[in-house]
């Protein structure tokens, strides 16, 4: 008897199960519809942080073409990117000022979000400073938006709970940057540059305990999309 082979793309296609002997299920990402534009390409730089995979997973969940890349990869070997995330890590950036090739990545003309160590490195690279925190933070903390919260905090409450895990912190905001969020223990919980393409977060939006972390990733994705459409 002749077998009928059907391929089912999740979310989009159904089949007549009675006439089909074999069914192959293929997960289709939300961006893969026939009329959709190509997905945004935003990679995550692995700086040795314990939650780097969560950043990658969040981007993928939100429909982004994303990979985790080592921070030693030369710029010449990067994909054509719409955005980049500099992850957190064990490196004491406030003491060493070093973080792989992240300095070279910051020369790229794309939106970049630094998280924890990535945030601290960004501050130092652009002329600010990071130092050992007087009160290291580990666990849930409450932050308050300042200066309107900037683009990353768009459509999130003025006061919210986030997840912290840091020994160092930004002590001096770079020229051309402004603070977007603060807490009682850390003045620079968030920062953004005046050009609107460099962003830093001291806390970890990728951790579930950060109430509006997904919103922040979505806001960054929208920034990357707008930047691509302008090119």
PLM regions and their residue ranges:
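Short, flexible loop/turn segments with low-complexity composition
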Residues: 228-231
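Cationic, low-complexity basic patches in intrinsically disordered or flexible, solvent-exposed regions
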Residues: 2-4, 30
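Eukaryotic N-terminal low-complexity, Ser/Thr- and Lys/Arg-rich leader segments
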Residues: 35-36
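Flexible gly/pro-rich beta->alpha loop and the following alpha-helix that scaffold active-site loops
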Residues: 39-45, 49-115, 119-120, 126, ...
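Pocket-forming structural segment of enzyme catalytic cores
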Residues: 99-115, 120-215, 219-223
């Amino acid at each position: 008897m002749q077998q009928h082979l059907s391929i089912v793309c999740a979310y989009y296609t159904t089949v007549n199960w009675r006439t089909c002997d074999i069914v192959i299920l293929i997960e289709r990402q939300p961006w893969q519809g026939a009329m959709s534009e190509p997905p945004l390409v935003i990679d995550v730089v692995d700086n040795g942080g314990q939650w780097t995979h969560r950043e990658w997973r969040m981007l993928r969940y939100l429909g982004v073409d994303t990979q985790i890349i080592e921070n030693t990869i030369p710029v010449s070997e990067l994909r054509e990117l719409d955005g980049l995330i500099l992850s957190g890590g064990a490196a004491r950036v406030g003491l060493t000022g070093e973080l792989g090739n992240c300095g070279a990545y910051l020369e790229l003309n794309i939106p970049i979000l630094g998280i924890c160590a990535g945030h601290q490195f960004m501050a130092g690279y652009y002329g600010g400073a990071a130092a050992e925190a007087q009160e290291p933070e580990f666990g849930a903390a409450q932050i308050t938006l300042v200066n309107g919260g900037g683009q990353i905090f768009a459509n999130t409450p003025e006061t919210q709970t986030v997840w912290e895990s840091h020994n160092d912190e930004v002590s001096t905001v770079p020229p051309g940057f402004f603070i977007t969020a603060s807490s009682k223990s850390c003045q620079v919980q968030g920062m953004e540059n005046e050009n609107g393409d460099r962003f830093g977060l001291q806390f970890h939006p990728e951790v579930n305990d950060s109430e509006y972390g997904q919103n922040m990733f979505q806001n960054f994705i929208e920034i990357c999309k707008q930047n691509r459409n302008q090119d």
